[in-house]
Swiss-Prot record:
The lineage of its organism: Bacteria, Pseudomonadati, Pseudomonadota, Betaproteobacteria, Burkholderiales. PROSITE patterns: RIBOSOMAL_S12. It comes from Polynucleobacter asymbioticus (strain DSM 18221 / CIP 109841 / QLW-P1DMWA-1) (Polynucleobacter necessarius subsp. asymbioticus). PANTHER family: 30S RIBOSOMAL PROTEIN S12 FAMILY MEMBER. It holds the Pfam family Ribosom_S12_S23. One of its GO terms (cellular component) is small ribosomal subunit. HAMAP family: Ribosomal_uS12_B. The keyword rRNA-binding applies. Gene3D superfamilies: Nucleic acid-binding proteins. This is Small ribosomal subunit protein uS12. With S4 and S5 plays an important role in translational accuracy. Interacts with and stabilizes bases of the 16S rRNA that are involved in tRNA selection in the A site and with the mRNA backbone. Located at the interface of the 30S and 50S subunits, it traverses the body of the 30S subunit contacting proteins on the other side and probably holding the rRNA structure together. The combined cluster of proteins S8, S12 and S17 appears to hold together the shoulder and platform of the 30S subunit. The gene is rpsL.
């Protein structure tokens, strides 16, 4: 326990909270242009071909972001919306691309969790 004199000489240091998604700069989402769309493999216990895109954001950052859902229509120069949220088994992927917004279409034939994948409600068969 420091004395009051010691605290006057050197105050307690404030805890610095580091952002988990610095490229967003405290915005909920950011717009960007795809510079490369490709697949990559996850870390050790898992095995797959995960779809990711390298995106140049409007604020100049270049980030790798994940494309969720089955199938996508992204190519180079597609304009996309980025949100925060990392992918645990892909190192360096700290952002997700928002489905159903700007150039990225929603997931086709999606019945559950539609809002997360930008899918419209299916028409009732009468």
């Amino acid at each position: 326990m420091p004395t009051i004199n010691q605290l006057i000489r050197k105050p307690r240091s404030r805890l610095i909270v580091k952002s988990k998604s610095p490229a967003l700069e405290n915005s909920p989402q950011r717009r960007g242009v795809c510079t490369r769309v490709y697949t990559t493999t996850p870390k050790k216990p898992n095995s797959a071909l995960r779809k990711v895109a390298k995106v140049r954001l409007t604020n100049g950052f270049e980030v790798i972001s994940y494309i969720g859902g089955e199938g996508h229509n992204l190519q180079e120069h597609s304009v996309v919306l980025i949100r925060g949220g990392r992918v645990k088994d892909l190192p360096g992927v700290r952002y997700h691309i928002v489905r159903g917004s700007l150039d990225l279409q929603g997931v086709k034939d999606r019945k559950q969790s539609r809002s997360k994948y930008g899918a419209k409600r299916a028409k009732k068969a009468a």
